[in-house]
Amino acid sequence: MKDHSPRKPEWLKQRLSAGDGFGALQRLLSSKGIHTVCRSAKCPNLQECWSEGTATFLLLGNVCTRTCRFCAIDTSRTPAAPETDEPERVAAAARTMALQFVVLTSVTRDDLPDGGAAHWVETIRAIRKASPRAGIECLIPDFAGNEAALDLVCKERPDVLNHNIETVPRLYEKVRPEARYRRSLDLLQRAASLFGLTTKSGMMVGMGESFEEVGEALQDLARHGCRMITIGQYLQPSARHIPVERYVTPEEFAGFRDLALSLGFSSVQSGPFVRSSYHAAASSAACTPVP
C-alpha cells in the first residue's frame, strides 16, 4: 500500500532520548521473555515510559488473530498456544519493577474457546499475590461477544476495565472489520452496570472521522457507563496499514477534552501522543470512585 499520509506537523516531531531506566527495564523484560504492547504496537511513548520504569504487559503472546488495519502487532489465524508460566513471569516482573499500578493488555485470541479469559484471570491473581498493594488496569479484547468470558475477568474486579472502541462506527468496516461497534459498547455497559467497575475506552483520530462523529461516539460511551477516555492521533505503523487522513491539531484535541468533560467523563486524556495506557495510574487516581 502506497503511503499517502500528509507531512507530519511540528507538534508530532519528538526528540527521543532514553533515560537511565530504559536499559534496565529492557533487560528485565527480555530476561523474563515478556512481551509489551509498547514494543509490539510501536508506541511513540515507549522511550518516555520505559525510562520512567513503566510498561504495559502484553498477554497471550504477541501474535493476534485479527487484522485491524491500524495495528502494528503481527497476525495469524493459528498463533502459538499461550505460555502457561506467563502469568507468574509477568507478576514477577511487576514485583521487581515495584509497580504501584500494573497495566495489562492482550492480543485477541479468537482461536481459544474463552478468548484467553482464564489466562487473564490467572495473571490478575498472580499479580495480586506478588504485589498485593498494586492497582490493576485491564485493557481487554471483546472476547468475540462471549459474556461468560467477559464475566470471568470482571469478577476479578480490576481497578479499571478498559476496552477501546478505537474509531467511529462509520469507519469500522475499513479500520477493524472483524470487530463490532455495538459489541464493544455492550461490553463496557455490562462491566459497569452488572459489576460496578470503573470503565475506560480509547479512540484514535485522523483516520477520516469528523468532529461531530467523535462527539457522537463519546455520547454513546457516556450512555453506556464509560467514565474514562483516551483520544490520540493515529500514526501509520507501515506502508501496508491505512494512511493518515489528517493530523489533528492540539486545539482540536483540547476541544475533544472539553466535550468529554461536559458529557460527564471523570478522566480525559486527549492529545497527539495519548495512547490507551498513557499515564494510566494518574488517570485512575483522578477518576472519582463509582458510587
Curated annotation (Swiss-Prot):
Classification via Pfam families: Radical_SAM
Pathway listed: Protein modification; protein lipoylation via endogenous pathway; protein N(6)-(lipoyl)lysine from octanoyl-[acyl-carrier-protein]: step 2/2
Listed GO CC annotations: cytoplasm
Subcellular location: Cytoplasm
Keyword S-adenosyl-L-methionine in annotation: yes
Binding site residues for [4Fe-4S] cluster 1: 38, 43, 49, 277
Cofactor requirements of the protein: [4Fe-4S] cluster
Cofactor note: Binds 2 [4Fe-4S] clusters per subunit. One cluster is coordinated with 3 cysteines and an exchangeable S-adenosyl-L-methionine.
Name this protein carries in UniProt: Lipoyl synthase
Gene that specifies this protein: lipA
